[in-house]
Protein backbone atom coordinates (compact mmCIF):
# COMPACT_ATOMS: atom_id res chain seq x y z
CA UNK A 1 0.00 0.00 0.00
CA UNK A 2 1.42 3.38 -1.02
CA UNK A 3 1.78 6.44 1.17
CA UNK A 4 0.89 9.88 -0.18
CA UNK A 5 1.07 13.60 0.49
CA UNK A 6 -0.43 16.60 -1.32
CA UNK A 7 1.61 19.74 -2.00
CA UNK A 8 -0.43 22.94 -2.21
CA UNK A 9 0.33 26.62 -1.68
CA UNK A 10 -1.07 29.95 -0.55
CA UNK A 11 -1.17 31.14 -4.17
CA UNK A 12 0.15 30.39 -7.62
CA UNK A 13 3.86 30.87 -8.39
CA UNK A 14 4.89 30.29 -4.77
CA UNK A 15 7.19 27.40 -5.66
CA UNK A 16 5.11 24.20 -5.38
CA UNK A 17 6.90 22.49 -8.26
CA UNK A 18 10.33 23.44 -6.94
CA UNK A 19 9.52 22.15 -3.44
CA UNK A 20 7.83 19.04 -4.83
CA UNK A 21 10.88 18.23 -6.94
CA UNK A 22 13.24 18.57 -3.96
CA UNK A 23 11.02 16.34 -1.81
CA UNK A 24 10.80 13.62 -4.45
CA UNK A 25 14.55 13.90 -5.06
CA UNK A 26 15.37 13.52 -1.36
CA UNK A 27 13.26 10.39 -1.02
CA UNK A 28 14.56 8.80 -4.20
CA UNK A 29 18.17 9.51 -3.24
CA UNK A 30 17.42 7.54 -0.05
CA UNK A 31 16.39 4.59 -2.28
CA UNK A 32 12.71 5.16 -1.58
CA UNK A 33 10.45 4.45 -4.55
CA UNK A 34 8.72 7.84 -4.69
CA UNK A 35 6.61 8.94 -7.64
CA UNK A 36 4.84 12.10 -8.75
CA UNK A 37 1.30 12.92 -9.87
CA UNK A 38 -0.61 16.05 -10.89
CA UNK A 39 -4.30 16.11 -11.83
CA UNK A 40 -4.32 19.13 -14.15
CA UNK A 41 -1.59 21.30 -15.62
CA UNK A 42 -2.04 24.44 -17.67
CA UNK A 43 0.63 26.54 -19.35
CA UNK A 44 2.33 23.49 -20.83
CA UNK A 45 5.47 23.78 -22.94
CA UNK A 46 5.50 23.12 -26.68
CA UNK A 47 8.66 21.28 -27.73
CA UNK A 48 9.08 20.14 -31.35
CA UNK A 49 5.32 20.65 -31.84
CA UNK A 50 4.59 18.34 -28.91
CA UNK A 51 2.82 19.44 -25.74
CA UNK A 52 4.92 18.78 -22.63
CA UNK A 53 3.85 19.02 -18.99
CA UNK A 54 6.58 21.42 -17.89
CA UNK A 55 6.07 21.02 -14.14
CA UNK A 56 6.24 17.25 -14.42
CA UNK A 57 9.29 17.47 -16.68
CA UNK A 58 11.03 19.64 -14.07
CA UNK A 59 10.28 17.17 -11.27
CA UNK A 60 11.48 14.27 -13.41
CA UNK A 61 14.73 16.07 -14.23
CA UNK A 62 15.50 17.15 -10.66
CA UNK A 63 14.53 13.81 -9.10
CA UNK A 64 16.12 11.75 -11.89
CA UNK A 65 12.93 9.90 -12.79
CA UNK A 66 13.00 8.00 -16.06
CA UNK A 67 10.12 7.93 -18.51
CA UNK A 68 7.60 10.30 -20.05
CA UNK A 69 6.55 13.02 -17.57
CA UNK A 70 3.24 13.54 -19.41
CA UNK A 71 2.12 10.13 -18.15
CA UNK A 72 1.85 11.38 -14.55
CA UNK A 73 -0.52 14.26 -15.39
CA UNK A 74 -4.18 13.54 -16.14
CA UNK A 75 -5.01 16.75 -18.04
CA UNK A 76 -2.48 18.94 -19.86
CA UNK A 77 -3.40 22.30 -21.39
CA UNK A 78 -1.34 24.77 -23.40
CA UNK A 79 -3.01 27.94 -22.15
CA UNK A 80 -1.50 29.48 -19.00
CA UNK A 81 -4.85 29.95 -17.25
CA UNK A 82 -6.72 28.25 -14.43
CA UNK A 83 -7.49 24.57 -15.27
CA UNK A 84 -11.24 25.16 -15.35
CA UNK A 85 -10.84 27.89 -17.97
CA UNK A 86 -8.33 25.85 -19.96
CA UNK A 87 -10.79 22.95 -20.00
CA UNK A 88 -13.53 25.28 -21.25
CA UNK A 89 -11.31 26.75 -23.97
CA UNK A 90 -10.41 23.25 -25.18
CA UNK A 91 -13.91 21.78 -24.74
CA UNK A 92 -12.54 19.13 -22.38
CA UNK A 93 -14.56 17.47 -19.64
CA UNK A 94 -12.45 16.90 -16.54
CA UNK A 95 -13.53 13.72 -14.77
CA UNK A 96 -12.96 12.98 -11.10
CA UNK A 97 -13.12 9.27 -11.95
CA UNK A 98 -10.18 9.63 -14.33
CA UNK A 99 -8.19 11.61 -11.77
CA UNK A 100 -8.73 8.97 -9.10
CA UNK A 101 -7.96 6.13 -11.53
CA UNK A 102 -4.74 7.79 -12.73
CA UNK A 103 -3.71 8.50 -9.14
CA UNK A 104 -4.33 4.89 -8.13
CA UNK A 105 -2.28 3.70 -11.08
CA UNK A 106 0.68 5.82 -9.92
CA UNK A 107 0.21 4.46 -6.40
CA UNK A 108 0.51 0.92 -7.71
CA UNK A 109 3.82 1.87 -9.31
CA UNK A 110 5.37 3.46 -6.20
CA UNK A 111 5.68 3.11 -2.43
CA UNK A 112 5.39 6.87 -1.91
CA UNK A 113 3.47 9.29 -4.12
CA UNK A 114 3.83 13.08 -4.06
CA UNK A 115 0.85 14.92 -5.53
CA UNK A 116 1.21 18.52 -6.68
CA UNK A 117 -1.82 20.78 -6.80
CA UNK A 118 -2.66 23.52 -9.29
CA UNK A 119 -2.45 27.18 -8.28
CA UNK A 120 -3.40 27.92 -4.67
CA UNK A 121 -5.72 25.92 -2.45
CA UNK A 122 -8.84 27.66 -3.84
CA UNK A 123 -8.49 26.51 -7.43
CA UNK A 124 -11.41 25.46 -9.66
CA UNK A 125 -10.32 22.46 -11.71
CA UNK A 126 -13.60 22.05 -13.59
CA UNK A 127 -16.50 24.49 -13.41
CA UNK A 128 -19.51 23.51 -15.48
CA UNK A 129 -22.66 21.68 -14.44
CA UNK A 130 -20.27 19.45 -12.56
CA UNK A 131 -17.85 21.37 -10.37
CA UNK A 132 -14.49 20.11 -9.16
CA UNK A 133 -12.41 22.20 -6.80
CA UNK A 134 -8.87 21.35 -5.76
CA UNK A 135 -10.15 20.54 -2.27
CA UNK A 136 -12.54 17.97 -3.78
CA UNK A 137 -9.57 16.16 -5.28
CA UNK A 138 -7.66 16.15 -1.99
CA UNK A 139 -10.71 14.69 -0.23
CA UNK A 140 -11.03 11.96 -2.85
CA UNK A 141 -7.35 11.04 -2.63
CA UNK A 142 -7.52 11.00 1.18
CA UNK A 143 -4.00 12.28 1.79
CA UNK A 144 -2.59 14.99 4.09
CA UNK A 145 -1.25 18.35 2.95
CA UNK A 146 2.10 20.12 3.01
CA UNK A 147 1.51 23.85 2.58
CA UNK A 148 4.10 25.93 0.70
CA UNK A 149 4.14 29.62 1.62
CA UNK A 150 6.31 32.63 0.77
CA UNK A 151 8.77 33.76 3.43
CA UNK A 152 8.37 37.52 3.18
CA UNK A 153 5.94 40.26 4.09
CA UNK A 154 2.33 39.06 3.96
CA UNK A 155 3.20 35.43 4.60
CA UNK A 156 1.45 35.27 7.97
CA UNK A 157 -1.84 36.57 6.57
CA UNK A 158 -1.79 34.36 3.47
CA UNK A 159 -0.75 31.25 5.38
CA UNK A 160 -3.32 31.59 8.17
CA UNK A 161 -6.16 32.33 5.74
CA UNK A 162 -5.19 29.28 3.66
CA UNK A 163 -5.08 27.08 6.75
CA UNK A 164 -8.51 28.31 7.83
CA UNK A 165 -9.95 27.45 4.41
CA UNK A 166 -8.34 24.00 4.56
CA UNK A 167 -9.73 23.44 8.06
CA UNK A 168 -13.20 24.48 6.88
CA UNK A 169 -13.05 21.64 4.35
CA UNK A 170 -11.99 19.11 7.00
CA UNK A 171 -8.60 18.48 5.44
CA UNK A 172 -5.36 17.84 7.31
CA UNK A 173 -2.17 19.90 7.06
CA UNK A 174 0.89 18.34 8.65
CA UNK A 175 3.56 20.97 7.92
CA UNK A 176 4.42 24.32 6.35
CA UNK A 177 7.41 25.08 4.13
CA UNK A 178 8.53 28.68 3.71
CA UNK A 179 10.06 29.02 0.25
CA UNK A 180 12.83 31.45 -0.77
CA UNK A 181 13.82 31.77 2.87
CA UNK A 182 16.69 34.08 3.80
CA UNK A 183 18.10 33.21 7.22
CA UNK A 184 19.59 36.71 7.51
CA UNK A 185 16.24 38.46 6.85
CA UNK A 186 14.56 39.56 10.09
CA UNK A 187 11.09 39.42 8.48
CA UNK A 188 11.61 35.83 7.34
CA UNK A 189 12.94 34.81 10.75
CA UNK A 190 10.03 36.42 12.57
CA UNK A 191 7.42 35.01 10.16
CA UNK A 192 8.70 31.50 10.85
CA UNK A 193 8.51 32.03 14.62
CA UNK A 194 5.02 33.55 14.50
CA UNK A 195 3.65 30.83 12.22
CA UNK A 196 5.03 28.10 14.46
CA UNK A 197 3.34 29.69 17.47
CA UNK A 198 0.03 30.45 15.74
CA UNK A 199 -0.41 27.12 13.93
CA UNK A 200 1.31 24.58 16.20
CA UNK A 201 2.64 23.04 13.00
CA UNK A 202 6.26 22.34 12.10
CA UNK A 203 7.53 25.14 9.85
CA UNK A 204 10.46 24.29 7.59
CA UNK A 205 12.40 26.54 5.26
CA UNK A 206 13.91 26.28 1.80
CA UNK A 207 16.48 28.84 0.71
CA UNK A 208 16.49 30.21 -2.81
CA UNK A 209 18.32 28.01 -5.33
CA UNK A 210 18.75 25.25 -2.76
CA UNK A 211 19.40 21.79 -4.18
CA UNK A 212 18.08 20.02 -1.10
CA UNK A 213 15.04 20.33 1.12
CA UNK A 214 16.04 21.06 4.72
CA UNK A 215 13.82 18.43 6.33
CA UNK A 216 15.31 15.36 8.04
CA UNK A 217 14.45 12.22 6.07
CA UNK A 218 12.76 10.55 9.04
CA UNK A 219 10.45 13.54 9.54
CA UNK A 220 9.72 13.87 5.82
CA UNK A 221 8.62 10.25 5.61
CA UNK A 222 6.22 10.78 8.51
CA UNK A 223 4.34 13.43 6.52
CA UNK A 224 3.16 10.75 4.09
CA UNK A 225 0.11 8.74 5.05
CA UNK A 226 -1.31 5.42 3.85
CA UNK A 227 -3.79 5.73 1.01
Curated annotation (Swiss-Prot):
<dbReference type="GO" id="GO:0000287">
    <property type="term" value="F:magnesium ion binding"/>
</dbReference>
<comment type="pathway">
    <text>Cofactor biosynthesis; biotin biosynthesis; biotin from 7,8-diaminononanoate: step 1/2.</text>
</comment>
<feature type="binding site">
    <location>
        <position position="55"/>
    </location>
    <ligand>
        <name>Mg(2+)</name>
    </ligand>
</feature>
<comment type="function">
    <text>Catalyzes a mechanistically unusual reaction, the ATP-dependent insertion of CO2 between the N7 and N8 nitrogen atoms of 7,8-diaminopelargonic acid (DAPA, also called 7,8-diammoniononanoate) to form a ureido ring.</text>
</comment>
<keyword id="KW-0067">ATP-binding</keyword>
<dbReference type="GO" id="GO:0005524">
    <property type="term" value="F:ATP binding"/>
</dbReference>
<dbReference type="InterPro" id="IPR027417">
    <property type="entry name" value="P-loop_NTPase"/>
</dbReference>
<dbReference type="GO" id="GO:0005829">
    <property type="term" value="C:cytosol"/>
</dbReference>
<keyword id="KW-0436">Ligase</keyword>
<comment type="similarity">
    <text>Belongs to the dethiobiotin synthetase family.</text>
</comment>
<feature type="binding site">
    <location>
        <begin position="179"/>
        <end position="180"/>
    </location>
    <ligand>
        <name>ATP</name>
    </ligand>
</feature>
<dbReference type="InterPro" id="IPR004472">
    <property type="entry name" value="DTB_synth_BioD"/>
</dbReference>
<feature type="binding site">
    <location>
        <position position="55"/>
    </location>
    <ligand>
        <name>ATP</name>
    </ligand>
</feature>
<feature type="binding site">
    <location>
        <begin position="116"/>
        <end position="119"/>
    </location>
    <ligand>
        <name>ATP</name>
    </ligand>
</feature>
<protein>
    <recommendedName>
        <fullName>ATP-dependent dethiobiotin synthetase BioD</fullName>
        <ecNumber>6.3.3.3</ecNumber>
    </recommendedName>
</protein>
<dbReference type="GO" id="GO:0009102">
    <property type="term" value="P:biotin biosynthetic process"/>
</dbReference>
<keyword id="KW-0460">Magnesium</keyword>
<feature type="binding site">
    <location>
        <position position="116"/>
    </location>
    <ligand>
        <name>Mg(2+)</name>
    </ligand>
</feature>
<feature type="active site">
    <location>
        <position position="38"/>
    </location>
</feature>
<feature type="binding site">
    <location>
        <begin position="13"/>
        <end position="18"/>
    </location>
    <ligand>
        <name>ATP</name>
    </ligand>
</feature>
<feature type="binding site">
    <location>
        <position position="17"/>
    </location>
    <ligand>
        <name>Mg(2+)</name>
    </ligand>
</feature>
<keyword id="KW-0479">Metal-binding</keyword>
<comment type="subunit">
    <text>Homodimer.</text>
</comment>
<dbReference type="Pfam" id="PF13500">
    <property type="entry name" value="AAA_26"/>
</dbReference>
<dbReference type="GO" id="GO:0004141">
    <property type="term" value="F:dethiobiotin synthase activity"/>
</dbReference>
<feature type="binding site">
    <location>
        <position position="42"/>
    </location>
    <ligand>
        <name>substrate</name>
    </ligand>
</feature>
<keyword id="KW-0963">Cytoplasm</keyword>
<keyword id="KW-0547">Nucleotide-binding</keyword>
<keyword id="KW-0093">Biotin biosynthesis</keyword>
Amino acid sequence: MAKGVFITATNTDIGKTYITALIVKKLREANINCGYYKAALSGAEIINNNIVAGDAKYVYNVANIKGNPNECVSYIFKQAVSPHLAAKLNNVHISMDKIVADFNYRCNEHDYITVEGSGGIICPIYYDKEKIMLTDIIKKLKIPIILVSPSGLGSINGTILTLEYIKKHNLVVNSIILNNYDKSNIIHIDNKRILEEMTNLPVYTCEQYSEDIDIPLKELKQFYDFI
